[in-house]
């Protein structure tokens, strides 16, 4: 695995890299807050896709079950193929799932196509967020980065 590129200005203090933490925060908030975001779309799901209350409950449940059931496997894959590749794989699966949900003509495809893909993608992204921090940040910056991810989880 490639070493992270860090900048050491005069005095030996490591510069905190902002762009990577922004990407990791957005990934953490996107995956952690997914069910909350779905709750905002309830009325549209009813109006456009003809969703029933059990459909919406199932859509919420399927994401959590997929993400949780494959989380350990997603972390194991990350240790084998590398955290960056694992993160990209998870992001691609999440993007594909979001596209399926956006284009789905009914709740069946929305749930069993889109929500499954997004949950499966999250099972790769969430461990990758935590796995990338030690490769990017060191010392006090690592503590700050983990704190930012914890705050992002709390906000979502």
Regions flagged by a language model, labelled:
Residues 2-156:
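Transmembrane-helix bundle of Major Facilitator Superfamily
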């Amino acid at each position: 695995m490639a070493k992270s590129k860090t900048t050491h200005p005069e005095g030996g203090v490591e510069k905190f890299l902002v762009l990577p933490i922004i990407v990791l925060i957005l990934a953490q908030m996107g995956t952690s807050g997914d069910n909350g975001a779905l709750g905002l779309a309830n009325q549209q799901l009813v109006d456009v896709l003809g969703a029933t209350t059990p459909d919406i409950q199932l859509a919420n449940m399927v994401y959590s079950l997929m993400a949780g059931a494959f989380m350990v496997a997603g972390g194991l894959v990350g240790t084998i193929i590398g955290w960056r590749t694992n993160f990209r794989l998870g992001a691609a699966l999440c993007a594909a799932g979001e596209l399926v949900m956006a284009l789905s003509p009914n709740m069946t495809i929305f749930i069993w196509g889109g929500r499954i893909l997004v949950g499966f993608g999250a099972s790769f992204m969430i461990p990758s967020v935590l796995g990338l921090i030690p490769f990017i940040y060191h010392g006090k910056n690592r503590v700050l980065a983990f704190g930012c991810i914890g705050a992002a989880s709390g906000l979502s």
